[in-house]
């Protein structure tokens, strides 16, 4: 009889003890400061058109670790170099996965890519393969002839405009340059005079960027948001965009099968070879969809970030004539009278590298990086960050933090003189490519494109504002979206440097 009562009492005692321990644990947990929100939507109304700017303003009141509720999703934003270090280095393994987002899920064939895939064995093996085969320093040097060819075409175009003293849309030209390099390196096909140089291709790329950076209700209300996306037409637009990109990839595969491509071995060749070798990634063999997902990363990542950085750099240089004169003098003195800059010359252009670092500080291409998802609970500054929390790092705000940078709104490349700070992910004051396990694997490729492109622009030409325009007329507005590009295009007049 005693045994009958003993077992239920033991069970209830265990439940009570567990409840008390849970209550005590919760009492010791500290949530980060949080701005007040509304029922259902939480803090969504506070995001604004440019979330990185809105969140930076909020962090000035609520601190560098801030908890918000975006719909039903708990979200933490870190906005200082110290808190970024804690998240991306000290606790990197706790928060190096990715959240489930509708646009990335569709474009990546259900997370078969490098950027948006959750953290697992498949992602680790895919990243290792891509770093070794696609983004290694060896591969970056192998495609240097492609960069040189595309830059030469651009310089010839500017020479024609200079002879006629006509303005050029530099934003558009730099975007075409990066598209040309990426398409030749990835697909073995020139941009000009091919299927790529069409309104349809431009629309495919534009729509893909739009879906990656626009508001999707299902990202914030997972259970019912898909209904809103369906009613607004977003779901249908997304599906059409994915079908269009899929058809484009298939067209590129057909060109390779038929041998109708140009030049040396490209990214598609390398990936198709790995598919033929039945390369195993995590839970299965490399398939055509895996290749398409990786090509999406190469295409969208390569086209967006390099052109954005070069455009912002030229914008800042036009607003700062002293810096423009200094960087051009360095380049022209170092290069001498050569008709073309080579990759080895770039290593000697120290002030140019400072100009680029300063551009990344003020204008990181992805101002909030790509969001992370917390896998296991950890603490930042004594605040508990639970599992399943979405995590953003506001690198745009970190670059403007007066506790880190003197005169943070001033464009001053000299701040990097005798400084060990660089953009390689170990200095948390400057994180244009992120840090930790989810750092951009194509950092070296992107940096090389920016350095080589800018060096040629500044070596071959002097740049003037269109007639009737003064420095004060240059606007600095950013466009909304995942990438913070210049909202209004930069239009300048090239003038041939006569001493060449």
Curated annotation (Swiss-Prot):
The chain crosses the membrane at residues 2-22. Its EC number is 1.14.-.-. The keyword Metal-binding applies. CDD domains: CYP71-like (cd11072). GO terms for molecular function: heme binding; iron ion binding; monooxygenase activity; oxidoreductase activity, acting on paired donors, with incorporation or reduction of molecular oxygen. It is a single-pass membrane protein. One of its GO terms (cellular component) is membrane. Disulfide bonds: none annotated. It comes from the Eukaryota. Its main location: membrane. Keywords: Heme, Iron, Membrane, Metal-binding, Monooxygenase, Oxidoreductase, Transmembrane, Transmembrane helix. Pfam families: p450. It is found in: Membrane. Its cofactor is heme. Heme binds at residue 440. PANTHER family: CYTOCHROME P450 71A9-LIKE ISOFORM X1, CYTOCHROME P450 FAMILY 71 PROTEIN. Belongs to the cytochrome P450 family. This is Cytochrome P450 71B37. It comes from Arabidopsis thaliana (Mouse-ear cress). The gene is CYP71B37.
């Amino acid at each position: 009889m005693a045994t009958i009562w003993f077992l239920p009492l033991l069970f209830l005692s265990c439940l009570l003890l567990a409840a008390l321990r849970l209550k005590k644990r919760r009492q010791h947990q500290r949530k980060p400061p949080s701005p007040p929100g509304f029922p259902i939507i939480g803090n969504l109304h506070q995001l604004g058109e440019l979330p990185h700017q809105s969140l930076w303003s909020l962090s000035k009141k609520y601190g560098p670790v801030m908890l918000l509720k975006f719909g039903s999703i708990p979200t933490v934003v870190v906005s200082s170099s110290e808190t970024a270090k804690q998240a991306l280095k000290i606790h990197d393994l706790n928060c190096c996965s990715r959240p489930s987002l509708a646009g990335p899920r569709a474009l990546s064939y259900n997370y078969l890519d490098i950027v948006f895939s959750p953290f697992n064995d498949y992602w680790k093996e895919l990243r290792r393969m891509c770093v070794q085969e696609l983004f290694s320093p060896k591969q970056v040097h192998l495609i240097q002839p492609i960069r040189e060819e595309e830059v030469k075409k651009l310089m010839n175009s500017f020479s024609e405009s200079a002879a006629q003293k006509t303005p050029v849309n530099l934003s558009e030209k730099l975007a075409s340059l990066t598209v040309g390099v990426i398409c030749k390196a990835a697909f073995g096909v020139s941009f000009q005079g091919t299927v790529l140089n069409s309104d349809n291709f431009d629309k495919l790329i534009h729509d893909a960027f739009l879906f990656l950076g626009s508001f999707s209700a299902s990202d914030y209300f997972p259970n019912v948001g898909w209904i809103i996306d369906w009613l607004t037409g977003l779901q249908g637009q997304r599906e059409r965009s994915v079908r269009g990109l899929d058809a484009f990839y298939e067209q590129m595969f057909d060109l390779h099968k038929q041998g109708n491509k140009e030049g040396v071995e490209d990214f598609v060749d390398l990936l198709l070879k790995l598919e033929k070798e039945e390369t195993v990634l995590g839970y299965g063999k490399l398939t055509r969809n895996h290749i398409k997902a990786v090509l999406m990363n190469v295409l969208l990542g390569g086209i967006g970030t390099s052109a954005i950085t070069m455009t912002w750099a030229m914008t800042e240089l036009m607003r700062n004539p002293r810096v423009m004169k200094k960087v051009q003098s360095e380049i022209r003195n170092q290069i001498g009278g050569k008709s073309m800059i080579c990759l080895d010359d770039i290593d000697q252009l120290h002030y140019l590298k400072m100009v680029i670092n300063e551009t990344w500080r003020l204008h990181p291409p992805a101002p909030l990086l790509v969001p992370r998802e917390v896998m296991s609970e950890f603490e930042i500054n004594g605040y508990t960050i639970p599992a399943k929390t979405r995590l953003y790092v506001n690198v745009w705000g970190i670059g403007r933090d007066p506790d880190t940078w003197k005169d943070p709104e001033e464009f001053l490349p000299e701040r990097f003189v005798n400084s060990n700070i660089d953009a390689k992910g170990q200095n948390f004051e400057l994180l244009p490519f992120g840090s930790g396990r989810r750092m951009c694997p194509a950092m070296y490729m992107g940096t090389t494109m920016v350095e080589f492109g800018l060096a040629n622009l500044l070596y071959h030409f002097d740049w003037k504002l269109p007639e009737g325009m003064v420095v004060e007329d240059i606007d600095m507005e950013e466009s909304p979206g995942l990438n913070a590009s210049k909202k209004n295009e930069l239009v300048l007049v090239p003038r041939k440097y006569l001493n060449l």
